[in-house]
Amino acid sequence: MQLARGVHIRVNDMLSCLLIDKNPNERRRLTQLLSGLGLFCHERDGAEEGIRFCQERKPDVVVMEASGLPAAKEFLRLVRYQNRTTKRPVVILYADKPDLEAVGESIMDGAADFLMKPFDRDLLQFKLEQAGVLPH
């Protein structure tokens, strides 16, 4: 399906989610969780691919593994810059062992929230509700 640049993706009226994680097993697990919450997932394995995806399409939410925080930081800055005048996707980051300074910087750079792994469906749903992606 060919879409015009900047078009928000909706599949059967589902919210779209860009999931970025290098680990295919983790992407599969999170896709199942996010799909169970009513989101249609597009998977990418790195920030560069995620940036290209966001340039071509406008997901409603981005859920991103942030262990390589320099890439996550660059991703947040580019998404913020490219979407100055349009709706930005909500970005939620997660990591195994985030340091508090990096978490704070990510929030300042535009991330809606930060999760510590491991997390379950209930916590993910709560964070998506808090960010305004899902209804309460």
Question: Which positions does each model-derived feature cover?
Answer:
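Alpha4 helix (beta4-alpha4-beta5 surface) of REC/receiver domains from two-component response regulators
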Residues: 73-74, 97-113
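Conserved phosphotransfer microenvironments
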Residues: 63-80
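Two-component/phosphorelay signaling modules centered on CheY-like receiver
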Residues: 24-42
